[in-house]
Amino acid sequence: MKKILDYIKDTKFKITIFENKIDIANYKEIIIFEENKIVINCNTFNISIKGNNLIINKVYDNEVLVEGNITNIEFR
């Protein structure tokens, strides 16, 4: 049971990359949202996602799912 509680309370940044999807957990804010570029702040750095037809499919308090033809991911 402790492991489940640790997961629920976890505040570390996590990114999971799928084909044409990126799931980002424990982000701070969405800075730029355009069809070809999305920038997300994760406290100490930003993630820049570039591609075509980018959309934010799901947004939760601490998680966001980006979909589209992703061509580049940068950590700054």
Regions found by a protein language model. Give the residues of each.
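N-terminal intrinsically disordered, cationic/polar leader segments
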Residues: 2-76
